[in-house]
């Protein structure tokens, strides 16, 4: 399995993501510049967190027009795995690969803390190593993480079991339906605001993010 971690101007979680795959999971992972136009040979592409292009206009709005984006879209269409974390989730919504949008937190403040998530759908390539309805502790760090979508879109997400992660107990940003992460209908594109790559070693405070990476590895072996 070969993984691409896309680096945009302003990305700051690309190293964390690389280390989670390379050091912890021993996967074959490479950094890929936003300037590239091909992702040939890769099985998974990751859009990491950060502040691509300084979050000007809207979060992810400029990154969405980078050279690499058509290749990401092609991977999604081919059924390959696409993961967007934090700013990566915002980019996926700007691309239209995932419905809805991420707006400013209800508090209008940047929130950096560990939150409790409930695994709503463990039947995806990203979550098959979690238990159904499992509660996990994952860090968040964002100012624009409040998930919004029209009621008909929210209803469709719920009916299709596309809500993958949901905030439990405290909703830190005002996301509708307490949504922390969603996938597309096909299940091969996941966007989430929390940072699983920051929860893969005990020395960092916990390993509740590790099953996500193990799930991806398992999906790659079975493909």
From Swiss-Prot:
SUPFAM superfamilies in alphabetical order: Class I glutamine amidotransferase-like
Keywords assigned by UniProt, alphabetized: ATP-binding, Cytoplasm, Glutamine amidotransferase, Hydrolase, Ligase, Nucleotide-binding, Purine biosynthesis
GO molecular function, one term: glutaminase activity
Start and end residues of each Glutamine amidotransferase type-1 domain: 2-223
A Pfam family per the record: GATase_5
GO-annotated cellular components: cytoplasm
Gene Ontology BP, a term: 'de novo' IMP biosynthetic process
Active site residues per record: 86, 195, 197
Its job: Part of the phosphoribosylformylglycinamidine synthase complex involved in the purines biosynthetic pathway. Catalyzes the ATP-dependent conversion of formylglycinamide ribonucleotide (FGAR) and glutamine to yield formylglycinamidine ribonucleotide (FGAM) and glutamate. The FGAM synthase complex is composed of three subunits. PurQ produces an ammonia molecule by converting glutamine to glutamate. PurL transfers the ammonia molecule to FGAR to form FGAM in an ATP-dependent manner.
Quaternary structure and partners: Part of the FGAM synthase complex composed of 1 PurL, 1 PurQ and 2 PurS subunits.
Protein name: Phosphoribosylformylglycinamidine synthase subunit PurQ
Native source organism of the sequence: Lactobacillus acidophilus (strain ATCC 700396 / NCK56 / N2 / NCFM)
Gene that encodes it: purQ
